[in-house]
């Protein structure tokens, strides 16, 4: 079996994690050569007063979170609060411990939040049920009531709502956070990521630009350059960014995403040497985003990047997926894909990659269905996911669930593309075959093949896929005794570069050998 899975096209857009996780990854630290005035900082005086009045775990955590965002971690009250938290080991959680350690500069050995390091299918089941997300929303509502002017709470709540597909509620919260603190790096990058998520790249670009810091802050500059690429434009910050990454005024970690974004620009221009050098610069002290971009560039464009062995990058699930696939280890890659999904449950990309691995490489249709279940939480009426979950459920003879998804697909109120309409017909054919209705199954598949032949794009690929699926069902229906179907399948001309189609046909041959 060929274990290649083509990674989706990638840009260095900002990841969006909950605030405490972002803090623990070091992405909100201040950087040299930029001195923000007191008027640019979100005031923490109220938090200090609350801490002095009531020295509790709750007050200490709140003060520390506000201090980190606003580059005030050296405040004596903040340091006192951090020490207080670490003295209450029996009353604090992992995130609170890590945040306090960060304040006291004991963060060198911090690990990614263990809550996202889940290797079992049970993790996917938890995300499908969304109980934890609803609990998170409930806790954040209480927090917002206590601190109605803290933008961080609204950003975190927006992320929780996006994870369960409530984009309108999420947008209201994002707008509130931007109103309270539009210059805040965490708020701006999270808001930009939200608008990219809902397809409004123009708004994302506007948010980053209006911070006023995208010409000085390397994290915001990286976002500006990448979002411009997504819009088919060239950022005005490229020249400034090139000067910045070779300046001694910035730490290697703070310019990692910037160097990666510039490397991607040069890669698209075809200047491979410049691209290689910039990617190598991004790997001096990478975060998970820049490391994944380098892995992607090596696979998709064969850029000869040097990735040091033994790099310990927190939450680098995506890059580990690509690395495992390069090593032809599908089982290891699905473990990392599940971690990635748990880390970014609102994002389609990890869901699509995880689905492809579990379906094409592992042929684990239960897992494929569960992965799509997570994707359908954040994208509840996505036609592709509804159809494909119906497909894998039908392949697994779970016909009731397959029919439920096809019913949802009929009423999803979204205009289907040509290829999606063909796939829907083919899936109806598969379900009919599994109901032992060969006549209807063959009729639906033949209609799908006919319609695929007249498609403007990807006609041959969609047609061949429908043919393979129909011939497989013919063979299964005949208990693999249909010699004409077998001969037709063997003689089917499949381009060697169409790995998914090659694997799909080989799967039929493998099943025949077991009979």
Regions found by a protein language model. Give the residues of each.
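Alpha-helical repeat scaffolds
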Residues: 15, 42-50, 60-64, 77-85, ...
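Terminal, low-structured helical/coil segments at or just beyond the last alpha-helical repeat
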Residues: 3, 7, 470-475, 480, ...
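Alpha-helical segment of the N-proximal tetratricopeptide repeat
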Residues: 29-55, 62, 66-69, 90-91, ...
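TPR-adjacent "capping" and linker segments in tetratricopeptide-repeat scaffold/adaptor proteins
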Residues: 3-7, 13-21, 32-39, 48-55, ...
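Residue-level recognition of tetratricopeptide repeat
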Residues: 65, 83, 125, 159, ...
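Alpha-solenoid helical repeat scaffolds
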Residues: 61-62, 79-80, 96-97, 121-122, ...
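Register position in tetratricopeptide repeats
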Residues: 129, 163, 197-198, 230-231, ...
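Short coil turns that delineate tetratricopeptide repeat
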Residues: 72, 90, 148, 182, ...
């Amino acid at each position: 079996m060929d274990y290649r899975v083509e990674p989706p096209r990638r840009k260095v857009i900002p990841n969006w994690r909950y605030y405490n996780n972002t803090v623990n990854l070091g992405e909100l630290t201040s950087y040299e050569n930029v001195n923000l005035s007191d008027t640019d900082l979100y005031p923490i005086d109220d938090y200090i007063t609350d801490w002095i009045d009531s020295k509790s775990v709750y007050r200490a955590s709140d003060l520390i979170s506000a201090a980190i965002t606003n580059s005030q971690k050296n405040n004596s009250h903040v340091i006192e609060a951090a020490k207080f938290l670490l003295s209450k080991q029996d009353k604090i959680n992992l995130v609170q411990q890590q945040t306090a350690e960060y304040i006291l500069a004991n963060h060198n050995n911090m690990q990614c939040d263990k809550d996202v390091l889940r290797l079992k299918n049970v993790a996917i089941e938890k995300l499908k049920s969304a109980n934890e997300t609803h609990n998170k929303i409930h806790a954040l509502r209480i927090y917002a009531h206590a601190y109605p002017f803290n933008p961080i709470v609204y950003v975190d709540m927006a992320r929780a709502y996006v994870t369960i597909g409530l984009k309108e509620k999420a947008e209201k919260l994002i707008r509130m956070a931007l109103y309270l603190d539009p210059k805040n790096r965490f708020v701006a990058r999270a808001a930009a990521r939200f608008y990219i998520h809902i397809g409004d790249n123009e708004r994302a670009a506007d948010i980053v630009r209006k911070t006023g810091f995208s010409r000085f802050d390397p994290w915001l500059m990286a976002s500006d350059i990448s979002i411009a690429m997504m819009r088919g434009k060239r950022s005005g910050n490229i020249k400034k960014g090139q000067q910045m990454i070779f300046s001694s005024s910035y730490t290697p970690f703070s310019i990692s995403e910037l160097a990666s974004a510039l490397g991607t620009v040069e890669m698209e221009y075809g200047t491979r040497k410049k691209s290689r050098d910039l990617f190598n610069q991004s790997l001096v002290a990478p975060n998970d985003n820049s490391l994944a971009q380098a892995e992607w560039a090596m696979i998709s464009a064969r850029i000869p990047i040097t990735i040091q062995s033994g790099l310990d990058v927190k939450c680098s699930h995506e890059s580990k997926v690509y690395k495992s696939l390069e090593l032809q280890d599908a089982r290891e890659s699905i473990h990392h894909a599940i971690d990635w999904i748990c880390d970014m449950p609102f994002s389609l990309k990890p869901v699509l990659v995880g689905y492809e691995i579990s379906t094409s490489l592992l042929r684990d249709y239960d897992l494929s269905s569960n992965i799509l279940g997570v994707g359908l939480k954040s994208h509840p009426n996505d036609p592709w996911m509804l159809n494909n979950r119906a497909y894998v459920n039908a392949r697994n003879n779970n016909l009731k669930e397959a029919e439920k998804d096809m019913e949802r697909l009929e009423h999803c109120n979204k205009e289907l593309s040509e290829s999606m309409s063909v796939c829907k017909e083919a899936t109806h054919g598969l379900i009919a075959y599994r109901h032992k209705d060969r006549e209807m199954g063959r009729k639906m598949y033949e209609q799908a093949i006919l319609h695929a032949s007249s498609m403007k794009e990807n006609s041959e690929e969609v047609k061949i896929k429908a043919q393979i699926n129909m011939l497989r069902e013919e063979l299964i229906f005949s208990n693999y005794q249909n010699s004409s179907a077998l001969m037709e399948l063997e003689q089917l001309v499949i381009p060697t570069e169409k790995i998914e189609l090659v694997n799909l046909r080989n799967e039929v041959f493998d099943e025949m050998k077991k009979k």
